[in-house]
Design a protein with these regions (language model features):
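Regulatory cytosolic signal-relay segments
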Residues: 54-134
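Short, structured coil/loop segments at alpha-helix boundaries
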Residues: 83-86, 105-108, 115, 155, ...
């Protein structure tokens, strides 16, 4: 999303009315470690810079570098948590946040992150992530059980219709929980979640998809056989890439794929025990069934259909 839509006047005022020049530089280095206000401004090293001038320079530079939203997120965190044991009261920060929202972003209070307004656009990077950015996320792997048999037994037109319906169901469930559909293959998909309680969002999305497909099999499936899905959810750190191929190489994605292939059954969602114990008891009660593969333990949610 283009930075030119930000007015930045509220940010400049917030900086010069709340922080010293040293603090401004310290905080901008949290999003751009190589930032040098003297090199960027042309001032001789060590030359005194007025507080308001420093605020203008830093805001201009961080905007040019495409890191303005990251900087605002940093200010929000410092205002709420402090820095190095010191509390900061950043005056006018609500106006700074409002300016970003006015520019077309939404704000997630759970993770203190801005993301694109889903009423205007939906992109795989939430309108924020750049290649190399690291985030904590949950990923959901989906596989169509018995895909080759379905393709063999049904006409191409019917397969395209049914799989198109499946994609709509999956996309709606993921996006409605602030996730993104990262890949869609002939027999599977990958969803990513990084906002709100992202692990729970991914798990609930997977459960919803399974139940929606059970209903679809009963009321709208044009194929000769039911469409049965195997799903898994795993969470952890990931380095974002705009390349779908590179994303599939990420450790948490590979673990989700392994989890699905090893432990998931048709019409089931599997999560690792390490992920399960981070969830609330109400959700754990739903995942009361456990499976063990080799030495690994998993929790499984499964829905039975009429002919099972």
């Amino acid at each position: 999303m283009p930075n030119v839509r930000f007015s930045t006047r509220f940010c400049r005022k917030c900086l010069y009315s709340s922080l010293s020049v040293a603090d401004m530089v310290r905080f901008v280095k949290m999003v751009n470690p190589n930032y040098d206000i003297y090199k960027r401004s042309g001032y001789p090293d060590g030359h005194p810079i007025a507080t308001q001038d420093a605020a203008d320079l830093i805001t201009r530079d961080i905007l040019q570098d495409g890191l303005y939203v990251d900087f605002v997120e940093t200010l929000i965190k410092i205002n709420s948590e402090g820095y190095m044991g010191r509390r900061y009261d950043l005056r006018g920060l609500d106006d700074v946040t409002g300016d970003v929202i006015q520019a077309g972003y939404s704000y997630d209070k759970t993770t203190d992150q801005f993301f694109e307004n889903q009423q205007e656009r939906i992109t795989r990077n939430w309108g924020r992530l750049l290649d190399g950015d690291e985030r904590q996320m949950a990923v959901m792997r989906l596989d169509i059980a018995g895909n080759s048999i379905l393709v063999k037994e049904n006409s191409r037109n019917l397969i395209e219709k049914a799989y198109g319906d499946l994609r709509k169901i999956v996309t709606k469930s993921i996006v409605s929980r602030l996730g993104r559909l990262w890949s869609w293959e002939g027999d599977g998909a990958l969803g990513a979640f990084m906002l709100g309680n992202y692990s729970r969002m991914a798990i609930i999305s997977g459960m919803e998809i399974i139940n929606e497909m059970v209903l679809y099999n009963t009321t709208g499936n044009p194929l000769k056989s039911e469409i049965k899905l195997r799903l898994s959810v795993h969470s952890g750190n990931i380095t974002y890439s705009s390349s779908e191929t590179e994303c599939l190489k990420a450790d948490i994605v590979r673990k989700a794929i392994t989890l699905e292939s090893k432990a998931a059954k048709p019409n089931s969602l599997v999560i690792s025990e390490s992920l399960a114990v981070t969830q609330d008891q109400a959700l754990l009660n739903i995942f009361s069934n456990t499976v063990t593969v080799s030495t690994d333990k998993y929790r499984i949610y499964q829905v039975s259909q009429k002919n099972e």
